[in-house]
From Swiss-Prot:
Belongs to the D-alanine--D-alanine ligase family. The keyword Cytoplasm applies. This is D-alanine--D-alanine ligase. Gene3D superfamilies: 3.40.50.20, ATP-grasp fold, A domain (3.30.1490.20), ATP-grasp fold, B domain (3.30.470.20). Pfam families: Dala_Dala_lig_C, Dala_Dala_lig_N. The gene is ddl. PANTHER family: D-ALANINE--D-ALANINE LIGASE, D-ALANINE--D-ALANINE LIGASE B. Residues 134-332 form the ATP-grasp domain. Its cofactor is Mg(2+); Mn(2+).
């Protein structure tokens, strides 16, 4: 089976997506037929496999590549010989952050009937917004930490709105990769941390920070009616997983398995199933959990994890190919114009 990797995007995680695509190239190798790069101006470009390395993208603004146009079933390439359709194999949406995880690309791909692996529109909207993710989890009976949502209008009242004490953690509500995330241990650090978070999002989420909390990551997908899980990872961290810890090492081959009881592993999987069903059908996602006093709490849902979290799976290639055979299908609406014909008949 062949794939097309779509990466880049107009987001703060643009470079992360490039590194993610390069890492996935090393895993899938010749199974990737095309690499399609989306730049910050929303132009699509075909990148040769030999150019899939960091040095090329560090200088890509100096390149003169012919832009492609997204159309039904593929991409349109114009040349002096005329227009040519590049028919795409199954697309892997590997655009992190805005464009890829907020629903824009899912909408485009569905609109043009291009088959893809990745979160659909509703899944993207709910998981990209951390506050909406918490509401979604609560409705499913999955625990989350206490939290406060701030915007520019109420940020001055942050301390009054919180029902928890220092230390706490501040996160942009619409950004991933730990960008703009800071731990605040005393009041004098608050303004700086808020300024940093508001650079990435119009809304900011504040949660209590629990030193030394156990954190577990679990990736997976649903293939037909059965779930396929990765093994559980317990990430090595200091205070929290910052940008460098999260993304500058996801090209690793394998991550260490967590040492946890069968009962706890089953709890993590049951919570994952609740969150996945059926919203995330067609996607490989990673759920990051906290365990506090033997209770499982959702930290966040990563709808497009770095390099699709391939390093957590014992047989990632088989998982991906099986998922490709179990993608959700949008029913085609038959337009019959019977109502219009009846109106015409009655005239």
């Amino acid at each position: 089976m062949e794939f097309c990797v779509l990466f880049g995007g107009a987001s703060f995680e643009h470079e992360i997506s490039i590194v993610s695509a390069i890492a996935l190239k090393g895993v899938l190798k010749d199974r990737i037929k095309y690499f399609i790069f989306l730049d910050e101006n929303h132009h699509f470009y075909l990148i040769e496999e030999s150019n899939m390395h960091s040095k090329y993208f560090a200088q890509i603004k100096e390149k003169k590549l012919p832009p492609l146009i997204l159309t039904h079933n593929g991409l349109l390439k114009n040349s002096f010989l005329g227009a040519k359709i590049i028919e795409l194999p199954l697309v892997i949406n590997l655009v992190h952050g805005g464009d890829g995880e907020d629903g824009k690309l899912a909408s485009l791909l569905e609109f043009y009937r291009i088959a893809f692996i990745g979160p659909r529109i509703e899944a993207s909207v709910l998981s990209y917004n951390k506050y909406l993710t918490k509401l979604y989890a609560k409705d499913l009976g999955v625990k989350t930490l206490d939290h406060v949502l701030l915007n520019e209008k109420n940020r001055a009242n942050a301390l009054d709105l919180m029902n928890f004490n220092f230390p706490f953690i501040i996160k942009p509500n619409n950004a991933g990769s730990s960008l703009g995330v800071n731990v605040v241990k005393e009041e004098k650090e608050l303004v700086y941390a808020l300024d940093g978070a508001f650079e990435y999002s119009k809304e900011v989420l504040i949660e209590p920070f629990i030193q030394g909390v156990k954190e577990y990551n679990l990736a997976g997908c649903k293939i037909k009616k059965d779930f396929c899980f990765s093994y559980v990872e317990e990430p090595n961290k200091q205070e929290f997983l910052d940008f460098k810890q999260k993304y500058l090492d996801f090209s690793r081959n394998k991550a260490p398995k967590a040492n946890l009881s069968n009962a706890l592993e089953e709890q993590l999987k049951e919570n994952f199933k609740k969150l996945y069903n059926d919203l995330f059908d067609g996607a490989i996602i990673r759920c990051d959990f906290f365990v506090i006093k033997n209770e499982v709490y959702l930290n966040e849902i990563n709808p497009i994890p770095g390099s699709l979290a391939n390093y957590l799976f014992d047989d990632f290639k088989t998982t991906l190919e099986n998922l490709a055979q179990s993608l959700p299908k949008t029913p085609k609406i038959q337009i019959k114009n019977s109502y219009l014909l009846q109106i015409q008949k009655n005239k």
